[in-house]
Amino acid sequence: MSNRVIIFDTTLRDGEQALAASLTVKEKLQIALALERLGVDVMEVGFPVSSPGDFESVQTIAKTIKNSRVCALSRALESDIDAAAQALSVAEQFRIHTFISTSTIHVENKLKRSFDQVLDMAVGAVKYARRFTDDVEFSCEDAGRTPIDNLCRMVEEAIKAGARTINIPDTVGYTVPSEFGGIIQTLFNRVPNIDQAVISVHCHDDLGLSVANSITAVQHGARQIECTVNGIGERAGNCSLEEIAMILSTRKGELGLETGINAKEIHRTSSLVSQLCNMPVQANKAIVGANAFTHSSGIHQDGMLKAQNTYEIMTPESIGLNRNNLNMTSRSGRHVIKHRMSELGYGEQDYDMDVLYEEFLALADKKGQVFDYDLEALAFMEAQAEDDDHFELQQLVVHSDSTEGSATATVKVAVNGETITEAATGNGPVDAAYKAVARASGCKTNITSYQLSAKGEGHNALGQVDITAKYREQNFHGVGLATDVVEASAKALIHVMNLTWRADKVADCKQRIQQNKQEFGSV
């Protein structure tokens, strides 16, 4: 048996079913091209009979993709198969994926037929799909809850009918690994023609076991895993592609299996899918979460500085990230601060480590995570009190035009103690407020991310706005909190402006240090 596991990506079919709004054809094509770069073997890109839009997107992708096989889904109905075949016909090679329910629950309650009738429908669908392509996949929907005798019969007959891939889905994410592995093993033991097809698995994450079940399945002989980028999909989602790829890569010695995935494209693909699908990746998500390669514990940070493999079983570079992060928090030791100052270009002679570390701990206790610009400001600015802000929002008044969608904001901003009043019109209240603040302060801020969340519940909830801005190749993080979202947004902007103002002051200090070094060196 081959040790190569086929990666069947269904982000654009099963994954898209979980989205609040459908993707456009252009967005689907962007994701398909990213999946091709990633190296997926097969991409299931839609359900053509479901809508003209889905038909168009399948056809467009099938025309474009060359290095992955494009697949479309169909029920065990000739009209569905016709639509799939027509949409895919523009591709040189393609796969038709047809399915029918096989569990007693589904057969009796959803299909309202006998199992023998369902078996005949499945065989007929596979034979009909073979008229269009040799590459036909058949799925036994809800296989995880199908009586094993019925499942073995269905698999054997589907292979006889011409299916070259047989998919065993845990449709409702119900099975546990030992149980699911046993199902796969039983199929290999009891289905006489099973060597004529690739056994595939499609596991859902309702109990958080989709990845574990998929790994167990390939240990028992399955050689295709159906998955999605970031694990998106119906209900609790699908098996996560990036987790499967990195498990098989990281534990290759133990599992003896491999994929054709270009792991260095994982992070880029994950970010694209998250952005286009408007589905943020949770920070603690394995492999691609923001904290996946971030270390906050002082003990862990010390180990990482001595040897990366003390606390990392894979490198961030392996998935296309530049480096890991050592979060500077109150748990960080002096060695971490010294290391970071060195990375920022400072020698021990440039600052007082005892004073810096004491001030660092005080700030970390107050705000949680300390960023590079905070650390530099602590080292080279005498005052870091929050009441010494250079910019202060004193007043904000917004008037919105509900018919045109525009808004006008008037602000009073204190700049180094002097109050300046300005007004501006924008595309909505937040845009207007930001333009007015920019006029009053004279600062242009390049905002790269904006996130709104609620603190508290009900009518007493506060709106929290978190923004990130790019300034002099550094990211600055601003936070604003208020009962009014526009006010919270303006406060977040003012926060960032004060940070960048301090950064300019630090830059002046750094320049003086460099000049002093040069003068000292020339004596």
Curated annotation (Swiss-Prot):
It comes from the Bacteria. SMART domains: LeuA_dimer. Its cofactor is Mn(2+). Mn(2+) binds at D14, H202, H204, N238. GO terms for molecular function: 2-isopropylmalate synthase activity; acetyl-CoA C-acetyltransferase activity; manganese ion binding. Gene3D superfamilies: 1.10.238.260, 3.30.160.270, Aldolase class I. Transmembrane segments: none annotated. Residues 392-523 are annotated as: Regulatory domain. PROSITE patterns: AIPM_HOMOCIT_SYNTH_1, AIPM_HOMOCIT_SYNTH_2, PYR_CT. Its EC number is 2.3.3.13. Keywords: Amino-acid biosynthesis, Branched-chain amino acid biosynthesis, Cytoplasm, Leucine biosynthesis, Manganese, Metal-binding, Transferase. It catalyses: 3-methyl-2-oxobutanoate + acetyl-CoA + H2O = (2S)-2-isopropylmalate + CoA + H(+). Residues 5-267 form the Pyruvate carboxyltransferase domain. Catalyzes the condensation of the acetyl group of acetyl-CoA with 3-methyl-2-oxobutanoate (2-ketoisovalerate) to form 3-carboxy-3-hydroxy-4-methylpentanoate (2-isopropylmalate). Belongs to the alpha-IPM synthase/homocitrate synthase family. LeuA type 1 subfamily. Homodimer. This is 2-isopropylmalate synthase. The lineage of its organism: Bacteria, Pseudomonadati, Pseudomonadota, Gammaproteobacteria, Alteromonadales. The gene is leuA.
